[in-house]
Regions:
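Short, glycine- and small/hydrophobic-rich beta-strand elements in well-ordered beta-sheets
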Residues: 1, 106-118
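DNA replication initiation on ssDNA origins
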Residues: 1-76, 84-92, 181
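Short, structurally constrained coil/turn elements
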Residues: 6, 109-110, 176
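DNA replication initiation modules
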Residues: 43-45, 58-98, 130-205
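Short amphipathic alpha-helical segments
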Residues: 95-107
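Glycine-centered loop/turn motif at secondary-structure junctions
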Residues: 105-110, 162, 166
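Residue-level signal for beta-strand positions within conserved beta-sheet cores that form or flank
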Residues: 112, 121, 181
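Short, conserved phosphate-binding/catalytic loop or strand-edge motifs used
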Residues: 116-131
Length: 205
């Protein structure tokens, strides 16, 4: 994930929990050389209260690049519902959106998600698969195509429900279809409005 530190960004690619519960983070620098940083759990918690993102996919350790060719596995369909107009009453619009979505879930118009985050100015909706999909195994080509097709239709379905309900201030962001997409980490602050990203729904089934 990325986080700001002294005004810049540091990119950590892999995380390992050590036997003593410390956390080891492998950092890729600009010249793709590895650097290793260690955090205690409390130090990591402190870091995670900052401006942090996490990738939806895992990446191969070829050169540390967050690019399509470097994607290793995908296991999440993420729907990003955003409010871009800063003049809009964000909470009122999101409450209205939540009612529409709840009705859609209850009436089987949409599959119930794994988790929903309030991102500060929108909703981040996660569908986490039971098994990840490898990006490089040739035998899984049809599975990958099916994943992409279902994912695109899912995002379109969210947008069509918003349109049908007359909600014009919230939009489904189709940029989430990018394999290298980053999403905000729950518990961190959205610097655009100072609000904390919170998990507001978690499917326990």
């Amino acid at each position: 994930f990325f986080h700001d530190k002294r005004g810049g960004y540091i990119k950590y690619a892999n995380a390992y929990i050590l036997p003593n519960d410390d956390i080891c983070m492998e950092q890729f620098t600009a010249d793709t050389q590895d650097e290793v940083c260690f955090f205690t759990p409390m130090e990591m918690f402190s870091e995670l209260t900052k401006h942090c993102y996490v990738s939806l996919a895992t990446f191969q350790k070829k050169d540390g690049a967050r690019r399509d060719f470097n994607v290793f596995n995908r296991s999440i369909m993420y729907v990003d519902l955003d409010i871009h107009d800063t003049a809009v009453d964000c909470e009122a619009v999101l409450n209205q959106t939540a009612l529409i979505l709840t009705d859609a879930y209850n009436n089987n118009q949409l599959p119930i998600p794994t988790m929903i985050n309030h991102t500060g100015r929108g909703l981040g909706i996660f569908y986490i698969l039971e098994h990840s999909i490898n990006e490089s195994v040739p035998e899984l080509k049809k599975t990958r195509l099916a994943f992409d097709g279902i994912y695109k239709r899912l995002v379109k379905k969210y947008q069509s429900l918003l349109d049908a309900a007359g909600i014009t201030d919230v939009h489904a962001d189709f940029a989430v279809l990018d394999k290298t997409r980053l999403v905000r980490v729950a518990g961190t602050v959205n610097p655009n409005n100072g609000k904390v990203c919170n998990t507001i729904f978690r499917n326990e089934d």
